[in-house]
């Protein structure tokens, strides 16, 4: 059987909020090493990859590997019934067609349990190649969310230009254009407020803001976000989940011809 208990249950609530608008259903691959999910979004434009390592859970048991087909909208509805302070336990038998979710209030005076029907999903796993990137930007996740939100009022796409001294986000549309430039921070007290840029070569790429705004739903999971870019390969937007793993989004750049058309 599979059983995983998470004292900080709010992490699972935040993960579902970050996934549910982008993907409707996905396979949760559960093994002794932890929980993994990989899925294209419903329009097959972006890819999501989630890792929650077993040691990040407070107790974790998995006797044999399971692939659980989950409707993320349904799971999100059930998790909304959990309080932010609740302890969450996930449980499934080896051949189960349901996943049990148990929510315990911290004072243990209230226990709620739900059973969610699982789905049969035929999922192909895509190999994600390890890649060296020309430009890696680490910045506060709230700042990235705000930039994407602000620029989506101007245009549908953002051009991210990365050079040694800073990174520029630009958008243009019918009302005009907007540019937001962030310089690398030299001295900040808190690491999560820093902007750091590792650049091997300059990068100038265009991405659909609609998808970046979906990705920023993961902002509550992490104070920082990492953007990794190279020409002609998908952008990686990574949110670390403290002591547990990460949530990564992949988005291919828009081709220049598409913009002209």
From Swiss-Prot:
Glycyl lysine isopeptide (Lys-Gly) (interchain with G-Cter in SUMO2), cross-linked positions: 164, 254
Residues modified to Phosphotyrosine: 211
Compartment annotation: Nucleus
Pfam families attached to this UniProt entry: PCNA_C, PCNA_N
Gene this chain is encoded by: Pcna
Disulphide linkage map: 135-162
Function noted in UniProt: Auxiliary protein of DNA polymerase delta and epsilon, is involved in the control of eukaryotic DNA replication by increasing the polymerase's processibility during elongation of the leading strand. Induces a robust stimulatory effect on the 3'-5' exonuclease and 3'-phosphodiesterase, but not apurinic-apyrimidinic (AP) endonuclease, APEX2 activities. Has to be loaded onto DNA in order to be able to stimulate APEX2.
Gene Ontology annotations of biological process type: base-excision repair, gap-filling; cellular response to hydrogen peroxide; cellular response to UV; cellular response to xenobiotic stimulus; epithelial cell differentiation; estrous cycle; heart development; liver regeneration
Subunit structure: Homotrimer. Interacts with p300/EP300; the interaction occurs on chromatin in UV-irradiated damaged cells. Interacts with CREBBP (via transactivation domain and C-terminus); the interaction occurs on chromatin in UV-irradiated damaged cells. Directly interacts with POLD1, POLD3 and POLD4 subunits of the DNA polymerase delta complex, POLD3 being the major interacting partner; the interaction with POLD3 is inhibited by CDKN1A/p21(CIP1). Forms a complex with activator 1 heteropentamer in the presence of ATP. Interacts with EXO1, POLH, POLK, DNMT1, ERCC5, FEN1, CDC6 and POLDIP2.
InterPro entries, sorted: DNA_clamp_sf (IPR046938), Pr_cel_nuc_antig (IPR000730), Pr_cel_nuc_antig_C (IPR022649), Pr_cel_nuc_antig_CS (IPR022659), Pr_cel_nuc_antig_N (IPR022648)
Keywords noted in UniProt: Acetylation, Disulfide bond, DNA damage, DNA repair, DNA replication, DNA-binding, Isopeptide bond, Methylation, Nucleus, Phosphoprotein, Ubl conjugation
Organism name: Mus musculus (Mouse)
Expression induction: Induced in IL2-stimulated proliferating T-lymphocytes.
Protein name: Proliferating cell nuclear antigen
DNA-binding region: 61-80
């Amino acid at each position: 059987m599979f059983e995983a208990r998470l004292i900080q249950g709010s992490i699972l609530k935040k993960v579902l909020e970050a996934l549910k608008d982008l993907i409707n259903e996905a396979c949760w691959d559960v093994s002794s090493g932890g929980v993994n999910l990989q899925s294209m979004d419903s329009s097959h434009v972006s890819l999501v990859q989630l890792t929650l390592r077993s040691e990040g859970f407070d107790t974790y048991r998995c006797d044999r590997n399971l692939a659980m087909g989950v409707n993320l909208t349904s799971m999100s509805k059930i998790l909304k019934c959990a309080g932010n302070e609740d302890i969450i336990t996930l449980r499934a038998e080896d051949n189960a067609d349901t996943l049990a979710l148990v929510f315990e209030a911290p004072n243990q005076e209230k226990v709620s349990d739900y059973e969610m029907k699982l789905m049969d999903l035929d999922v192909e796993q895509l190999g994600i190649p390890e890649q060296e990137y020309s430009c890696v930007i680490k910045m506060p996740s709230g700042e990235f969310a705000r930039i994407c939100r602000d620029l989506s009022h101007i245009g549908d796409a953002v051009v991210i230009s990365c050079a040694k001294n800073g990174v520029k986000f630009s958008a243009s549309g019918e009302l005009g254009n907007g540019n937001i430039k962030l310089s690398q921070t030299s001295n900040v007290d808190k690491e999560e407020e820093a902007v750091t840029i590792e650049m091997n070569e300059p990068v100038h790429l265009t991405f659909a803001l609609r998808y970046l705004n979906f990705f920023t739903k993961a902002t509550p999971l992490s104070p920082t976000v990492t953007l990794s870019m190279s020409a002609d390969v998908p952008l990686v937007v990574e949110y670390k989940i403290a002591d547990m793993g990460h949530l990564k989004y992949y988005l291919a750049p828009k081709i220049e011809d598409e913009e002209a058309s």
